[in-house]
């Protein structure tokens, strides 16, 4: 059994251009009749497994809110009664969507998530953990009645036809689960709260288009490097403000300007790339960036490598250990050990911040 709750603040958060959504998932050890293995024997911070499930839910529900809805919103989900034959990760999205659907939050769902595995030639929806061990294809997909929102998983060299069939099989179940949520909403759903109408300025938007579009096109077609391109695009924004009538600067809305400019820049660059079949750095759409690889880049670690693709670099190390170095995975359903650990770090300087 899964408990899902959804709460949103009554007032929108001012001065932001993103949706402040928080999704948390936790598997209570009591759900499986277990005591946590930590020193204090209390529930601790979210495990990597729980964080990954949070991301699955977040990616599925985040697009389903109005663009101008910026109220703080929390979706908290707990496993409160476990079943060793059921993987909860494929049900968490359904629970979150159901909670949002019957709440007063302006959620434009419902959505649902299911796991689909190909086992001995058959496509099975939400297989048991034991069944999934023999899967040659194993995916989680999220969707609405009309569309697929997200697909994530793994396979052993699955064909494109198998992947499409798995998605079709899962979507049939998603449609049924969405219809069930709609019925639930009609029976006990709360009236949806009103969403604040965003302030718009059609005259300012047109001025931004007239001044910026041609300049953005020139930058997009110049086959420049990332840093030079970023500098020139930033200069376009500065030039617009510098050329804005001085008598109107007192009422100039910088937030609206940034909103309009970002939308226009995105749409203009997308149109240029699609029409010309050339990427921003001059590559064709089917041409990859230059690759460079170097092994043993560091003298002391057991192994290391430097991988470079264009302006993107990854420095990796590998450490070998004995069985005593295995990672203990203390989940609600069972205690297990992991002999391969992949740790990923993305510090702020990676993007120049």
Task: Locate predicted features.
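Conserved mixed alpha/beta core segments that line enzyme active sites in large multi-domain catalysts
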Residues: 79, 83-88, 97, 110-117, ...
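A generic local secondary-structure boundary/capping motif
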Residues: 10-12, 61-66, 101-104, 113, ...
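Glycine-rich, flexible beta-strand/loop modules in the N-terminal catalytic cores of phosphate-handling
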Residues: 1-86, 145, 152, 302-353
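Alpha/propeptide regions of enzymes that mature by internal proteolysis
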Residues: 18, 23, 44-66, 70-76, ...
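Short beta-strand-initiation
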Residues: 18, 109-111, 134-136, 286, ...
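Extended amphipathic alpha-helical scaffolds
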Residues: 1-9, 13, 196-336
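Mobile "lid/hinge" segments at catalytic clefts and subdomain interfaces of large enzymes
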Residues: 104-224
């Amino acid at each position: 059994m899964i408990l899902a709750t959804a709460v949103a603040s009554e007032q929108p958060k001012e001065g932001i251009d993103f949706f402040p959504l928080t999704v948390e998932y936790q598997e209570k050890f009591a759900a499986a009749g277990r005591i946590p293995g930590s020193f204090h024997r209390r529930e601790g911070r979210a495990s990597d497994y729980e964080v990954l499930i949070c991301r699955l839910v977040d990616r599925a529900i985040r697009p389903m809110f109005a663009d101008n809805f910026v109220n703080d919103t929390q979706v908290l989900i707990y496993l409160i009664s476990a079943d060793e034959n059921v993987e909860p990760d494929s049900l968490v999205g359904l629970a979150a969507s159901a909670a949002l659907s019957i709440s007063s939050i302006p959620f434009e769902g419902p959505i649902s998530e299911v796991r689909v595995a190909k086992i001995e030639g058959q496509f099975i929806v939400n297989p048991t953990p034991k069944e999934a061990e023999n899967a040659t294809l194993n995916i989680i997909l999220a969707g609405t009645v009309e569309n697929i929102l997200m697909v994530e998983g793994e396979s052993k060299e699955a064909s494109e036809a198998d992947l499409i069939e798995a998605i079709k099989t899962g979507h049939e179940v998603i449609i049924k689960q969405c219809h069930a949520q709609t019925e639930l909403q009609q029976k006990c759903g709360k009236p949806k709260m009103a969403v604040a109408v965003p302030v718009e300025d059609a005259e300012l938007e047109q001025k931004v288009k007239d001044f910026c579009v041609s300049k953005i096109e020139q930058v997009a077609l110049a086959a420049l490097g990332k840093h030079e391109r970023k500098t020139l695009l930033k200069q376009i924004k500065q030039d617009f403000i510098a050329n804005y009538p001085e008598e109107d600067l007192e009422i100039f809305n910088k937030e609206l300007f940034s909103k309009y400019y970002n939308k226009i820049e995105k749409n203009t660059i997308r149109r240029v790339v699609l029409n010309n079949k050339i990427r921003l750095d001059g590559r064709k759409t089917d041409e990859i960036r230059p690759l460079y690889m170097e092994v043993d880049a560091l003298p002391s670690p057991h192994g290391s490598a430097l991988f470079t693709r264009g302006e993107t670099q990854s420095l990796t190390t590998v450490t070998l250990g004995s069985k005593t170095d295995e990672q203990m995975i203390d989940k609600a359903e069972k205690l297990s050990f992991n002999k391969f650990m992949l740790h990923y770090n993305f510090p702020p300087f990676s993007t120049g911040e």
